[in-house]
Design a protein with these regions (language model features):
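Hydrophobic beta-strand scaffold residues
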Residues: 110, 199, 220, 279-280, ...
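Adenosine-phosphate binding glycine-rich loop
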Residues: 163, 254-350
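Rossmann-like adenosine-cofactor binding region
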Residues: 206-286
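N-terminal ligand-binding/catalytic initiation module
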Residues: 1-141
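Glycine-rich phosphate/diphosphate-binding loop of Rossmann-like nucleotide-binding domains
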Residues: 146-233
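Predominant activation on well-ordered alpha-helical scaffold segments within soluble catalytic domains
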Residues: 55-62, 93-104, 124-127, 152-160, ...
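Flexible, glycine/charged-enriched surface loops at secondary-structure junctions
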Residues: 69-74, 109-114, 168-175, 223, ...
């Protein structure tokens, strides 16, 4: 395998493969860009079928983090870590300590945090061996902790902005289909329900869907039919590549706005959404609430009010993207990519 010729290799600055025989750790850390600051992005633990697929995910996710941090106006670059393993069966404190040593060896070039398959508890183990970690448990009133609810808040505000732009109205009485009901999807459903939204939900873990049904009165639908449900907004909050040439024709919603990373299977899928008249909120713009929280925690000296003020800029950025895309007759994803690259390039010149 030639790493430098892989389709998802995008001039990444560094890719680190880590293995610890004693704990069974197999991890990849990808640093896409440090033009704006140290690379920051979460650590995902997933049972990848192969190391090639894990590498592809790390490359794509780290690039997305560069764009996310740039668009959120953070002084952070983009990186991501993936641990190959079943998060429900293979976690041990020693494994995350070994991962922490791998992070520490980079000397601050990469700052980690929790992501899919990892938690604040796991990050506490990492923090025992390296200072280059965020998303840690904090005392009441301190900035930090699980970034999921902050991601959900940003997505909620982004959905409001997309609905105003596309439909010219508020949320009450609309139907939102939410895919994935974990650490972001569930709190997002709470925020939507409080605004009078009708919820249709799906998750591969039936117990999570049932929990949301009992708490919020959501309609539970099979995972494989959610795209085809009558809904005003589709909010993907699980894994990526959900929007493709095969899935887009099945969509019934007029707006796509969710928390999942890398929602487009291919860059060209943004064009397909535009042709279908579907407004797409670029994932790394709408889901930046979590990394904003992580950044404020890591830098220190911040407040919850400052974090919320930064997250409340997300709808403004989305609206600017929507307006520019409409004026230029280009996909919102293309416009967002260009804006992110421009900020990264400016950082390299500085």
């Amino acid at each position: 395998m030639d790493l430098f010729s892989l389709p998802d290799f995008d001039g990444h600055e560094q890719v680190v493969f880590g293995h610890d025989r004693a704990t069974g750790l197999r991890a990849i850390i990808a640093i896409h860009s440090s033009a704006l600051g140290p690379a920051a992005g979460g650590c995902r633990m997933w049972a990848y079928p192969s190391s090639d697929e894990a590498l592809t995910d790390a490359l794509r996710l780290s690039r997305g983090m560069s764009y996310k941090n740039a668009m959120a106006e953070l002084d952070l670059g983009g990186g991501k870590a993936v641990i190959i393993g079943d998060a429900r069966a293979h976690k041990t404190p020693a494994l995350f300590q070994a991962f922490g040593r791998l992070v520490d060896a980079l000397g601050g070039r990469y700052i980690t945090a929790e992501d899919v398959g990892t938690s604040t508890t796991d990050m506490e183990q990492v923090a025992g061996v390296t200072p280059y970690v965020s998303g840690l448990k904090r005392a009441s009133g301190e900035v930090g902790g699980d970034p999921g609810p902050k991601t959900a808040l940003g997505v909620f505000l982004g959905i409001q902005a997309a609905v105003r732009f596309q439909l010219g109205r508020g949320l009450e009485g609309l139907t939102v289909a939410v895919q994935g009901l974990g650490g972001v999807g569930h709190p997002l459903c709470r925020l939507l329900a409080a605004e009078g939204v009708r919820l249709k939900v799906a998750d591969a873990r039936a117990e999570l869907a049932e929990r949301v049904r009992e708490e919020l009165g959501a309609a539970v639908v099979p995972v494989d039919t959610l795209l085809e449900q009558d809904a005003d907004v589709f909010a993907p909050c699980a894994l990526g590549a959900v929007l493709s040439a095969q899935s887009i024709p099945r969509l019934r919603a007029r707006i796509i706005a969710g928390a999942a990373n890398n929602q487009l299977a291919r860059e060209s899928d943004g064009e397909l959404l535009m042709q279908a008249g579907i407004l797409y909120a670029p994932d790394y713009v709408i889901n930046a609430g979590g990394i904003i929280n992580v950044a404020h925690e890591y830098r220190g000296g911040s407040t919850e009010a400052a974090v919320h003020a930064a997250i409340k800029k997300i709808p403004e950025r989305l609206t600017a993207i929507f307006e520019r895309a409409r004026q230029e007759s280009r996909p919102t994803s293309t416009v967002a990519d260009q804006m992110a690259r421009e900020r990264l390039q400016a950082g390299r010149r500085a």
